[in-house]
């Protein structure tokens, strides 16, 4: 098991569209284990593979109080079951210390595979529905701050930079930024 570096906003790799998982291999199962460990270590409730620079359609989450009931969703598809959207305050491991309200459908159908390749087809609501939609956004290159005003996006970017500088000074593992092309 290994802790994986979590990409931070505005890293352009977070905008990469994830590709479907073709088969649940030993490598995928190892990634799932590492993602769950990383999510718990970061005190999160959900993590998409895109956030740890693996651009495949894979989500892990655990909404239990004891953090002992991880769920895995491979190649997830979500269908809203209600038209009305409700605001929920969201945060994100890729946008540390930034929280804001995002409106999403409160009830959805989730179709996916679990870590053993078994089909999942459930109707979910509340926090689980919101969490699944939030993590699915990551698989599509969308970050929750994209739903906010430009001013709030700028503030979020500035806050993340400050948080990362503090974390680096404290010796925490921070994902390296993608190399920038050299100026010619």
UniProtKB/Swiss-Prot annotation:
Its EC number is 3.5.1.88. Its cofactor is Fe(2+). Coiled coil: none annotated. The keyword Iron applies. CDD domains: Pep_deformylase. Binds 1 Fe(2+) ion. Keywords: Hydrolase, Iron, Metal-binding, Protein biosynthesis. SUPFAM superfamilies: Peptide deformylase. The keyword Translocase does not apply. The active site is at 135. One of its GO terms (molecular function) is peptide deformylase activity. Pfam families: Pep_deformylase. One of its GO terms (biological process) is translation. Fe cation binds at residues 92, 134, 138. It comes from the Bacteria. It catalyses: N-terminal N-formyl-L-methionyl-[peptide] + H2O = N-terminal L-methionyl-[peptide] + formate. Belongs to the polypeptide deformylase family. Removes the formyl group from the N-terminal Met of newly synthesized proteins. Requires at least a dipeptide for an efficient rate of reaction. N-terminal L-methionine is a prerequisite for activity but the enzyme has broad specificity at other positions. This is Peptide deformylase. It comes from Psychrobacter cryohalolentis (strain ATCC BAA-1226 / DSM 17306 / VKM B-2378 / K5). The gene is def.
